[in-house]
Amino acid sequence: MKEFDTIAAIATNLGESGVSIIRVSGDKALSIVSSIFTGKNDRKLDDIRTYSMRYGFIIDKDTKEKLDEVIVSYMKGPRSFTAEDVVEINCHGGVVVTKRILEEVVAAGARLASPGEFTKRAFLNGRIDLSQAEAVIDLINAKTELSAKSALEQSEGKLSREIGKIRNKLLEIIASIEATVDYPEDDLEEVTSEKGRESVSKLLDEIDSLLDHADEGKILREGLNTVIVGKPNVGKSSLLNALLMETRAIVTDVPGTTRDVIEEYMSIDGIPIKIIDTAGIRDTDDVVEKIGVEKSREKINNSDLTVLVLDNSRGLDDEDKEIINFIKDKKYIVLLNKMDLESKIDKEALKELNSKYIIEISAKTGSGLDKFKEVIKELFFSGKVASKDVMITNTRHKEALIRAKESLEASKNALDNTFAIDLASIDLRNAWKSLGEINGDTVEEDIIDKIFSKFCLGK
């Protein structure tokens, strides 16, 4: 285990609440907190047992004034989250008292932790690997139960074990090839090449199996970026409100009411959907509305799915056609809204749209919305949302797997030529290194720092 100084931070949201927690980690954690703690009969924390709690007060070290009534818990390393001695002060929630206690902890010798530093220490101390550390923040940020389940499984090491198995198999192939290179025999080289090709083919199948559902995994982690577009007053905001089952956007008969982008999350059978309601796209002289229209175009360009809303009670006009032309190369669904009104739209003209999904809905009555949700599942999850044994949810992991696959394919080509068997060993080591980036064995330090910088304070 590495040696670090003792760090402290508020581990809960800072605000009015029932309880706040100040977390302290390091070899001096217990002595630091003990110096500002007084229990019943002036009892300190010197004799506290690991995995136990003690009632008392946090005091101002200089004035001996009581700051708050607390319960202190102690976990002796390495059997703690960071694999170090960890003390947690459970105090009353509230900004003033929580900050005041943290100030006393720092004054007593601790250093303020940087974002994600507790989890980073767990990684550097070998308690978790990098993919497990990333799963911690994914679990915190999960928007649906399915997202949370996927993150929890990764935090428990499911992906780590799978990657570890593949890397161990790679080492066996490398050892076999390098032994053949060191002790060359013509017939042995041929046998090694043949066995190596078979083994590499099996590993390629395993990596392909992991990559097969990576796009689905990314959606579970980040949400399906879904942009609602259309000209003003076709019912985009009404659709957003209907999907969320609450009044989130202002709805009026005045075109251009929505002038900015509104983003909210919803769940479709566990799929986190990031719904983005945009300003109606049209030519306008209004400066504020014009900014909203430009934002709408940006969101469309960065979307996973575009939802084009057309007004069934009116025919297609030039504004509709301009939007259709703008999104024609995107993956999009067409919603014919206001089906509760008389239909005036030209259905034949709609057949020319580059979308096989044209759904009749009424945002006002909710008619057709279930069909819309089923189509989203069909488009991105083949109609069924199922948790796979091991799900690749992180783009960084996907890219590492792709690099490993490319190296394995290169090694297979080298093994086809027994004269280049030593080159295969180089490619196999590159694949092993790429896979090691997933669990952190071979990743660069700046990437590690970047990953943990995305964490919140106290985690």
From Swiss-Prot:
Q: What is its EC number?
A: 3.6.-.-
What superkingdom heads the lineage? Bacteria
Query: Which compartments is it annotated to reside in?
Result: Cytoplasm
SUPFAM superfamilies per record = P-loop containing nucleoside triphosphate hydrolases, TrmE connector domain
State a single Pfam family of this protein: TrmE_N
What NCBIfam families does the record point to? mnmE_trmE_thdF (TIGR00450), PRK05291.1-3 (NF003661), small_GTP (TIGR00231)
* Descriptive protein name: tRNA modification GTPase MnmE
* Species whose genome carries this gene: Clostridium novyi (strain NT)
